[in-house]
Amino acid sequence: MPTNWLLPESIADVLPSEARKIEELRRRMLDLFRTYGYELVMPPMLEYIESLLSGTGHDLDLKTFKLVDQLSGRTIGLRADITPQVARIDAHLLNRAGVTRLCYAGSVLHTRPSGFHVTREPLQIGAEIYGHAGLEADLEIQELMLAALSAAGLADVRLDLCHVGVVAALLEQSPIAARIQDDLFTALAAKDVPALRAITVDLPPAQRDAINLLPALYGGVDVLARARKQLPALPAIGRALDDLATLAERAGGATVNIDLADLRGYHYHSGVMFTAYVAGVPNAVARGGRYDKVGEAFGRARPATGFSLDLREVAGISPVEARAAAIHAPWSGDAKLREAIAALRAAGEIVIQSLPGHPEDLEEFAYDRQLVEESGRWIVKPRNASI
């Protein structure tokens, strides 16, 4: 039996019903971003590997497919994340002095899936603000992320908030911080308390005790009050907790959880981090946060904050109905019929002619009207039980 139709593991075609929903959501979200003043950019699918991985850490390196460019002999990569590309555009190509709002939508490719039943070819859509270091930009991005999920019809959103500044303040001036950082953040993200105790054993007692408290500082907004009592009264920690409190207040109808140990993506995040979940879905549906240092690799450090989500994943759980209303027309050589169809299509209507011998596909389109001839004129009428 031939197997040349098989696709690689965790790679799949997008069939019409799914593609319709994905495209509907893509349009809704990009239109939403435009109402906030975000400009669309379209980075290339591949770049030199040094550019793709600049300032992103080891995780993205492992996710990136690499190959040799036959023109230059240099190593190039297929993008695994569009965010660094947009940072490059802001830092090197646009070179604006003030605030820049950019958005994007495009496929990325991963060497390995990021979870169970997850595609290796996500369709990433997102938005970024460059040039403003204040919390106002983070508030706008959080609002936009929640609005995008609302546009997809997703309810019962849970928003998990974290801040890299808490751990950074606890590790500041520690002579062993650089040596233990990777293992420390991995243990925190996994809430692996025994590993955390082993990793922090050589830290000063005050720092060690505070870091070992972080996995337990998880729950509702009341966690912030507990954190103020239990963590050292350092100015940087106070500012981080204040930022989280403000973000929680502005979360709209989302349920807010505080998780001071959820530091996935710490390699490039530099401040607040937010992750969105919906009921019944184990994986996060959207992620965002501040990453002020990514632009440094392109010669121009700029304050930056943004979010992204996978349209394919969101479409799979969205209740949005994407079946388009359509007008059915018979197949005929009548010039007046062709003129009527052309006029309707010019007005934005979907008009589908049944080819001879082939009934219309009622599953793909919602035929609610039909073109019928009356007294030599073709007019649109509500669809009857049969055509």
From Swiss-Prot:
Bilayer-crossing residues are none
Any signal peptide, and if so, which residues?
A: none
Is ATP-binding a UniProt keyword of this protein?
no
SUPFAM superfamilies membership: Class II aaRS and biotin synthetases (SSF55681)
Any one GO MF annotation of this record: histidine-tRNA ligase activity
Principal localization reads cytoplasm
Q: Which UniProt keywords apply?
A: Amino-acid biosynthesis, Cytoplasm, Histidine biosynthesis
Q: Name one GO cellular component term.
A: cytoplasm
Compartments in which it is found = Cytoplasm
Q: What does this protein do?
A: Required for the first step of histidine biosynthesis. May allow the feedback regulation of ATP phosphoribosyltransferase activity by histidine.
Q: What else is known?
A: This function is generally fulfilled by the C-terminal part of HisG, which is missing in some bacteria such as this one.
Protein name stated in the entry: ATP phosphoribosyltransferase regulatory subunit
Which organism's genome codes for this protein?
Ralstonia pickettii (strain 12J)
High-level lineage:
Bacteria, Pseudomonadati, Pseudomonadota, Betaproteobacteria, Burkholderiales
UniProt gene name = hisZ
